[in-house]
């Protein structure tokens, strides 16, 4: 039964460091990895590719139900494949991120993608990265972590990432977009962004990634009694 397969959920807002933490934990434990945020981004990108209105739940549901998405882990990086095409870079644009937050707010869209996310639960275990992994998708997960950081710190991190890729970034605009997205995610009617009652809340604002990984792995191993 899949219920016997352990899951570590890592929830939190964008820019808190969830992706880096999940890859490090998956590598350390030798577990599978699910980037649930990527699924919503892939759906948003598919909608943009197929000219489907990202604000129309009716139009998005059939697209979500037949979404052709795969995750391929290669040399420590996660390749996201949509309809046979590597879209790992394309789904990380701010346009797609904003669209993903909109499509994720629709109840029927979330339901259409729920089964697909749960299907990633395979032995020896799963690291699930998202916003409602511990509250909705895997409520029975034995280890739940909510990774947070201030909006200002997350905006600075995102700005550095984009600048390293050669993009010209306006910090105030980026901060405003992050705050708007936070407000939308935390206050939506369906699966709002909140820590699970039994989650460890880990604030990464003043921590470097190595410290975050160390704290998260220590907590997970204590909960799972994994050597």
Curated annotation (Swiss-Prot):
GO BP annotation list? nucleobase-containing small molecule interconversion; pyrimidine nucleotide metabolic process
> Which EC class is this protein assigned?
transferase
Q: What is its main location?
A: cytoplasm
Known SUPFAM superfamilies for this protein?
Answer: P-loop containing nucleoside triphosphate hydrolases (SSF52540)
**Known EC number:** 2.7.4.25
Per the record's keyword annotation, is ATP-binding included, yes or no? yes
* Record keyword Iron present: no
Reaction(s) catalysed by this chain's protein: CMP + ATP = CDP + ADP; dCMP + ATP = dCDP + ADP
Q: Where in the cell is it found?
A: Cytoplasm
Question: What's an example of a GO molecular-function annotation for this chain?
Answer: dCMP kinase activity
Q: Which UniProt keywords apply?
A: ATP-binding, Cytoplasm, Kinase, Nucleotide-binding, Transferase
Question: Pfam families recorded for this chain?
Answer: Cytidylate_kin
- What is the top-level taxon of the source organism? Bacteria
| Sequence positions that bind ATP | 12-20
Gene3D superfamilies named in the record: P-loop containing nucleotide triphosphate hydrolases
Mention any one GO cellular component term assigned to this protein in its UniProt record: cytosol
> Record's HAMAP family?
Cytidyl_kinase_type1 (MF_00238)
So what family is this one in? Belongs to the cytidylate kinase family. Type 1 subfamily.
Kindly give the PANTHER family that the UniProt entry links to this protein: CYTIDYLATE KINASE, CYTIDYLATE KINASE/PANTOATE-BETA-ALANINE LIGASE
The protein here is known as Cytidylate kinase
Q: Which organism is it from?
A: Klebsiella pneumoniae (strain 342)
Q: What is the lineage of its organism?
A: Bacteria, Pseudomonadati, Pseudomonadota, Gammaproteobacteria, Enterobacterales
């Amino acid at each position: 039964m899949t219920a016997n397969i352990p899951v570590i959920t890592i929830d939190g807002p964008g820019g808190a460091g969830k992706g880096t933490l999940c890859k490090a934990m998956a590598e350390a434990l030798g577990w599978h990895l699910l980037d649930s945020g990527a699924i919503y981004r892939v759906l948003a990108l598919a909608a943009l590719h197929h000219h489907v209105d990202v604000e129309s739940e009716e139009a998005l549901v059939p697209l979500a139900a037949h979404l052709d998405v795969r995750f391929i882990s290669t040399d420590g990086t996660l390749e996201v494949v949509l309809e046979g095409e590597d879209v790992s870079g394309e789904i990380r644009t701010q346009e797609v991120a904003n669209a993903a937050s909109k499509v994720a707010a629709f109840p029927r869209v979330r339901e259409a993608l729920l089964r697909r996310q749960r299907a990633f639960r395979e032995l020896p275990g799963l690291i699930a990265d998202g916003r409602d992994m511990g509250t909705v998708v895997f409520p029975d997960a034995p280890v739940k972590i909510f990774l947070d950081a201030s909006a200002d710190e997350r905006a600075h991190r995102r700005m550095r990432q984009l600048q390293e890729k050669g993009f010209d970034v306006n910090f105030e605009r980026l901060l405003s977009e992050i705050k708007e997205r936070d407000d939308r995610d935390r206050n939506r009617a369906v699966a709002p962004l909140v820590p699970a009652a039994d989650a460890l809340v880990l604030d990464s604002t003043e921590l470097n990634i190595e410290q975050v990984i160390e704290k998260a792995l220590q907590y997970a191993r204590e909960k799972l009694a994994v050597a």
